[in-house]
Amino acid sequence: MSINDKPIGFFDSGVGGISVLKEAFKLLPKEDFLYYGDSKNTPYGTKKVEEVKALTFNATDFLMSKGIKALVVACNTATSVTINDLRENYDIPIIGIEPALKPAVELKKGGKIIIMATPMTLAEKKFANLMDLYKETEDIEPLPCPGLPELIEQGIVSGDVIYNYLKDKFSKYDDEKISSIVLGCTHYPFVEETLKEVTHNKACIIDGSFGTSRELKRQLKNSNMLREENRVGKVTIFNSREDKDIIDLSYKLFNMK
């Protein structure tokens, strides 16, 4: 098999990275994708750094054994703590994801920029460096959201539980002007509609899925690794939980409009 015909690997701590996979499949419809969700060990956002590194390398080894030509780490937490180590150890294009703060700043709407993310993403040096670029000129507030990925892993993406969780998180901003909300975890796009409801649709909601997918395409094109033939690609999903329910949920989220 030529390298062009090999699949692209995707990895996340659970089902969240499927939000990125959806964007990538739209952008690269001829490609085959292998997605590995580590729902058995989710969430990563409250774990120790070394544990996240070990789990990420285990997942990468699994996907490498399937013959992938590139890897997307579709997990903000795993990107923040392991992306450099991965690139040093594997000789394929490796693309990560980080909170899309730059697009939020470039909107120039005025008002507060809120970054929803896991506690670990917000605690890492990579995030601090990102904040340093803009904190002198912008009103940016990190908002840790522990527990939200676990709800989404159960398939709870709307309804009272999600509404009340988000309402509680955002109630302190009721009297403030919010220009944008950056979704700093790949699970969060699945609750975007409820988030709009809670914030009365007054803020732009931004996630990094499109930017990551565009970077994937750019790197594959520059390396002459894109599939050329006229075909429709396929998506195959694996999960460390190895039960039908989580696989069914994964495909349901992938096909969700």
Swiss-Prot record:
Catalytic residue positions: C75 (proton donor/acceptor), C185 (proton donor/acceptor)
Record GO biological process: cell wall organization; peptidoglycan biosynthetic process; regulation of cell shape
Pathway assigned in UniProt: Cell wall biogenesis; peptidoglycan biosynthesis
Molecular function via GO: glutamate racemase activity
Reactions catalysed: L-glutamate = D-glutamate
Keyword Kinase: no
Protein function: Provides the (R)-glutamate required for cell wall biosynthesis.
NCBIfam families: glut_race
UniProt family annotation: Belongs to the aspartate/glutamate racemases family.
Descriptive protein name: Glutamate racemase
Designated gene of the protein: murI
